[in-house]
Design a protein with these regions (language model features):
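Extended, charged low-complexity regulatory segments
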Residues: 1-196
Length: 197
């Protein structure tokens, strides 16, 4: 039996609300990351001041803290990128295995509210390949070392977001017959992909 649920962002108002939520989550993630980075920087400073060069255990702690600090800095940079432009695309589909409708927003960097609530998926996620590689209708995507999933792709949407504002969005099934708009979107798609790479 097919389970249906209300998918997010069907109307412009709903899309604007989802963007506002996504920006809020991205800002919270960035603030949390900055606080963690500052604490690690303070810890590094304290370790360097407190222990001598001959203290092997302290040197090991210093080394481990330095590695965690560098990773935290990389995470901050990812959070900053996510905050500037949270997502550029979206896919809606019916998952044949789960027997339910799904919607995923796709961005340069994944954004999560918590461990299970993905607000935006990373463009490199296996399911995101559907956005680039498939037309609407029945298709598949594969997860390495796992399996191939069958889906029915209902919507592929492209977003234009600038200065925290949703400028516009386009569904691929709506614009397929409009030659000028298709050319415009193709140009913007190259720009989006260029930004990603």
């Amino acid at each position: 039996m097919k389970e249906t649920k209300q998918l997010p962002g069907i109307t412009r108002e709903a899309e604007e609300q989802y963007l506002a939520r996504t920006i809020r989550v991205a800002e919270q993630n960035l603030e949390r990351n900055l606080a963690g980075e500052k604490k690690l920087a303070d810890d590094l400073h304290d370790l360097m001041e407190s222990y001598g060069a001959k203290d092997v255990e302290a040197l090991s702690m210093l080394h481990n803290t330095q590695i965690i600090y560098e990773e935290t800095k990389r995470d901050r940079e990812r959070c900053e990128r996510a905050r500037k432009k949270p997502y550029f695309g979206r896919i809606d589909f019916y998952d044949e295995d789960l027997k339910k409708d799904e919607a995923f927003y796709i961005g340069r960097v994944g954004i999560s509210e918590n461990i299970t609530d993905k607000v935006v998926i990373d463009w490199r996620a296996p399911v995101a390949s559907v956005y680039y590689e498939n037309a609407l209708g029945r298709c598949t995507y594969s997860v390495k070392n796992e399996k191939t999933y069958e889906i029915d792709l209902h919507r592929k949407r492209t977003y234009e977001i600038e200065d925290d504002q949703l400028k516009d969005f386009y569904d691929s099934d709506v614009v397929a017959n409009d030659e000028l708009l298709t050319k415009y979107l193709a140009k913007n798609k190259k720009a989006v992909l260029g930004e990603i790479i």
